[in-house]
């Protein structure tokens, strides 16, 4: 088995993945959302301290799963990029300590690659090559995944990410953090869902294959300020619905542009924000229109988790892509390459 560790942001997670058949044997996770909610977003120093507390607790649960028999573990895998430096280092320190004390090889995994492999948790075979939309609080990307060693970025955000824009809109409406499920609930509760969009869809007339949410976010801010004296539940629902609709339409618009040139046969959607049901439905329709197979990460593995890191590290284990402890470092940025 491979013991995998994830600590790139505000989720502490450990998992055990069986090497021979890619089955997830154990998966434990502690979310920090309640600790960061009063700040309206993740506080790096607080996240780091909580990882220092939570990772050892999760390791104890792993020990119980193993009946304290660590001989079953053949390698340690750790997310080392991208993410918050102060949280990545917490996971890396644990991984190094385990690697040294158990005399096991160390595997460094890219967090974005891990999200791609969230599509294949509990599956020995992958469906690569495929294209992937990754939407989360930190990223809005289209990736082309040819195989484990060839995953490249073909489109990214010029400013805010998809998930981050939901957090900021929720904060404007004084509704808390994380904003994804809050704004989604507003949209679901809105009673006039067939109205024309009140907010502009970003980059509608731009030829660039990219994402941008800052203009949409600013349009929401102006609407909130205009309605400040009467920002009741119905107004918030209307704003939430129209914002979400415009944000998803932007993703669809840009992905359609990509589809017209690349014509992928398989398209995946991953990342924490991919839990949004309206987004999933919109992409079902898009993929149907282009005769493209849609694959979705299971809802429980959309947000950051060690199970996806364990699954991706199986490929590294088979290829013996191990890293000496003295060369094991972190990076706040991904080293996945962008296509020219």
Swiss-Prot record:
InterPro entries: ATPase_NBD, Gcp-like_dom, KAE1/TsaD, Peptidase_M22_CS, TsaD. Its main location: cytoplasm. It catalyses: L-threonylcarbamoyladenylate + adenosine(37) in tRNA = N(6)-L-threonylcarbamoyladenosine(37) in tRNA + AMP + H(+). GO terms for cellular component: cytoplasm. Substrate binds at residues 134-138, 167, 180, 276. Keywords: Acyltransferase, Cytoplasm, Iron, Metal-binding, Transferase, tRNA processing. Belongs to the KAE1 / TsaD family. Its cofactor is Fe(2+). Fe cation binds at residues 111, 115, 304. Gene3D superfamilies: 3.30.420.40. One of its GO terms (molecular function) is iron ion binding. Its EC number is 2.3.1.234. It is an enzyme of class 2 (transferase). It is found in: Cytoplasm. Required for the formation of a threonylcarbamoyl group on adenosine at position 37 (t(6)A37) in tRNAs that read codons beginning with adenine. Is involved in the transfer of the threonylcarbamoyl moiety of threonylcarbamoyl-AMP (TC-AMP) to the N6 group of A37, together with TsaE and TsaB. TsaD likely plays a direct catalytic role in this reaction. It holds the Pfam family TsaD. It comes from the Bacteria. Binds 1 Fe(2+) ion per subunit. This is tRNA N6-adenosine threonylcarbamoyltransferase. It comes from Helicobacter pylori (strain P12).
